[in-house]
């Protein structure tokens, strides 16, 4: 299913991190003291590796990010939909993966790398903007935090950044939607102009495979507007 937006190219989507100018058990075994009992049935729990992952193949190597689709469903759905070419936008033809070939247009050492702008100018985007989705459990508390770049409230589009370090001053201002699980060394090696050669989405586990990004976007269409 294709998510349809009636949109025009945004006049303003500078997305320059408004707040950034302020400078980013093991289990024990207890011996039985009575008659041996049959073990009780265990509840099935999800594998800790289950989830939705963004695999960003760059010219410097691979970055793997676990996307927080349960806590930031709308933001993750937007990223996934664009990455898989399912969201209609003004930058690329329908069906084409949005992020493939886009460069990291802004890099601040010991702070963050920023990409997702098809024009590489810092003002480009998909032709629409959507509301901030700030979850209290998702904070800029560690290196490898993936968060939305914006030009103020409700101006999210396609630009995102990944941090080199903890950046708590961005909490509440930028929507966190994932964390790097592999490839932080690649994040740290990226310089301005390095390219996202391919961005793919990997779903691991039953819940992740059943999650429908396009349905999430359809359910939240009132939070999107043309730009």
Question: PLM features: residue spans?
Answer:
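Bacterial N-terminal signal peptides
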Residues: 6-18
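Cyclophilin-like peptidyl-prolyl cis-trans isomerases
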Residues: 20-227
């Amino acid at each position: 299913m294709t998510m349809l937006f009636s949109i025009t190219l945004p006049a303003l989507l500078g997305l320059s991190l408004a707040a950034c100018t302020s400078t980013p058990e093991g289990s024990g075994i207890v011996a039985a003291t009575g008659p041996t009992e049959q073990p009780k049935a265990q509840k099935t729990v999800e594998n800790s590796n289950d989830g939705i992952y963004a695999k960003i193949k760059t010219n410097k190597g691979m970055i793997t990010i676990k996307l927080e689709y349960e806590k930031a469903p709308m933001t993750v759905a937007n990223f996934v939909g664009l990455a898989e070419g399912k969201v209609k936008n003004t930058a690329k033809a329908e069906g084409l993966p949005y992020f493939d070939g886009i460069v990291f247009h802004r890099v601040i050492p010991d702070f963050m790398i920023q990409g997702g702008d098809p024009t590489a100018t810092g003002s480009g985007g998909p032709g629409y903007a959507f509301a901030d989705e700030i979850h209290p459990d998702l904070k800029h508390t560690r290196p490898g935090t993936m968060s939305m770049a914006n030009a103020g409230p409700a101006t999210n589009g396609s630009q995102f950044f990944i941090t080199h370090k903890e950046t708590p001053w961005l909490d509440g201002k930028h929507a966190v939607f994932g964390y790097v699980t592999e490839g932080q060394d690649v994040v740290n090696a990226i310089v301005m102009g390095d390219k996202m050669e391919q961005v793919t989405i990997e779903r691991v586990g039953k819940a992740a495979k059943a999650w429908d990004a396009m349905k999430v976007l359809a359910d939240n269409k009132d939070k999107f507007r043309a730009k």
